[in-house]
Amino acid sequence: MVKIIECPRDAWQGLSQFVPTEQKKLYLDQLLKVGFDTIDFGSFVSPKAIPQMKDSAEVLNGLDLDNSPSKLLAIVANKRGAEDAAAFEEIDVLGFPFSISEEFQQRNTGSSIDQSFGRVEEIQNICEKTGKTLLIYISMAFGNPYGEAWDPEIAVNWSQRLHAELGIEVFALSDTIGVSDKKPMFLPCRDYLVVVDWKTYQNQCS
């Protein structure tokens, strides 16, 4: 089965001009009619980091969710953001950007990969208590522009550890820099498909 995550959040956060809250709501209401499996609509992170998404809580108010099969996903980067997002009944999925690039993880979340592993544990605990699903975006899954070691096995190995130690079951392989090629990822992922729910996500920021 093919499941599509639509991600207006990723496009919005790259815009310098603020998109009005009501305009975001109108657009999301149209997307909710399409039937996507999940819509990554917003983020609960510091507004200093991503000013465009400072209204994510307001955007939820008044969305027409009754007649849509789509689940709503919000990005979080730490325990506080997870607690804020999990308080909303409308949100089904919390997403955490877990990069296999040390450089990008520091830039994106202000934490090392090892520190981020600890954050994932905290967020997973919150999800389990509140009935949410935690999706891990494996950032830089298809390449690394910083000259660091990269191999498909690195993405798979981190995913295996997140699954085995923390019980994470849903992963999105994220093409952060737009260089995806399914061939190098196929063999490492093939034997692991029976264990976790893999999604592929062509994305420029997560």
Residue ranges and their predicted role:
Residues V2-D10, D37-F41, S70-V76, D92-F96, ...:
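Hydrophobic faces of well-ordered beta-strands that scaffold small-molecule active sites
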Residues Q17-K25, L73-E83, N108-I123, A149-N157:
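Glycine-rich anion/phosphate-binding loops
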Residues Q52-M53, A57, E83-F88, Y146-A155, ...:
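Distinct, well-ordered alpha-helical segments
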Residues D37-G62, F98-S111, M140-Y146, A172-K183:
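Glycine-rich, proline-tolerant flexible connector loops at the mouths of alpha/beta enzymes
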Residues M1-R80:
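N-terminal capping/small domains of soluble enzymes
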Residues M1-S16, F96-N108, K132-Y146:
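N-terminal small/glycine-rich loop or linker at the start of catalytic domains
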Residues G35, A87-L94, L166-E169, D191-T200:
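Glycine-enriched alpha-helix->loop->beta-strand junction motifs that scaffold or abut catalytic
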Residues A49-A74, Q115-L135, W158-S159, M185-C205:
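Alpha-helix-loop-beta-strand connector modules within alpha/beta enzyme cores
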